Amino acid sequence: MGLLKSHLTVCLPPSVPFLILVSTLATAKSVTNSTLNGTDVVLGSVPVIIARTDHIIVKEGNSALINCSAFGIPDLEYKWYNSVGKLLKEMDDEKERGGGKWQMLDGGLLNITKVSFSDRGKYTCVASNIYGTINNTVTLRVIFTSGDMGVYYMVVCLVAFTIVMILNITRLCMMSSHLKKTEKAINEFFRTEGAEKLQKAFEIAKRIPIITSAKTLELAKVTQFKTMEFARYIEELARSVPLPPLIMNCRTIMEEIMEVVGLEEQGQNFVRHTPEGQEAPDRDEVYTIPNSLKRSESPTADSDASSLHEQPQQIAIKVSVHPQSKKDHVDDQEGENLEVKDEEETEPSEEHSPETAEPSTDITTTELTSEEASPVEAPERELPPAHLETTEPAVTCDRNTCIIYESHV
């Protein structure tokens, strides 16, 4: 009876928590080996996981410590496996790597020294005793800090830069060869036919007169012809040069210059061609261009400067009608009164004696001849009228106006 009343005492390690001990005792199987004489009693339990760790993060080059976190009575036997299912052993590691990579510590600890990027993965701990077996898996993650990827990216950048430089150098070489060929073609062109075209253009440019306020519209028209001729030669020269289409159209440039200067508008307003035998219209100023000033039929199509001094074929001069001044009007009235008095005196004399009529007619003829001689004295300014009857409309139309008729050449 004294044996039944005796209390059981169990020695527990101080590092195990009290709660874990209670749970272990509740689930463990009690094994009692006793005799009738009251022999000793031995207790044990299956392995259990006291803490679970999902993953561990370690930088490359550092050491990693992985705990199995298993407990059991009696003491457990630990084995570690990597992600490919290989059993990790210190003896094998010493033979393969020279030792020191894998270290199996007491309490189910796995120490990995000098972790590399290839050591990443899952590690499984298998703990077992006479009562059972349990396993725990921990994932090891390695932070890549090695310079291998930096070297890789550097190599990629260097290769890309080399390719770009090769392409640029090739393009520059092609452009240089093209420019050399173009320069050679230009030099060859100007040594042969280009020199002749430049000489012709230079000769035309030398003949272009300078327009001033004292020049006439015919000279302006000649200047326009010469300038357009020079532009045509320059355009032909530019088109014949073996270059890409980078040279602008010279004719377009010259036309823009003409529009700015206003020569084209002046030529349209003041210069026009009048057919021969046709009277000029009633305008302020009408000029015709002689054929000698037009473009000739020569191969170079240039006109002579001496053609400016030739007489035009037809010039239409305006007929101006303007009022007389007061002094001229008084003189005309006095002259008309004198003529009327002379006519009145001659009429009675003719009635009385026909012989006395002859001196009066002589006086009138002398007056007429004196009137005719006045325009002859200045032949340089204008030509005299063909008949005296042309002056009669000036008297009959209006006494206050003077009409001047000028003939056509």
UniProtKB/Swiss-Prot annotation:
Topology class, membrane: Single-pass type I membrane protein
Extracellular compartment spans: 29-148
Coiled coil start-end: none
Segments on the Cytoplasmic face: 170-409
Signal peptide: 1-28
Function: May participate in the nuclear signaling of EGFR and MAPK1/ERK2.
Name of the protein: Microfibrillar-associated protein 3-like
Source organism of the structure: Rattus norvegicus (Rat)
Lineage: Eukaryota, Metazoa, Chordata, Craniata, Vertebrata
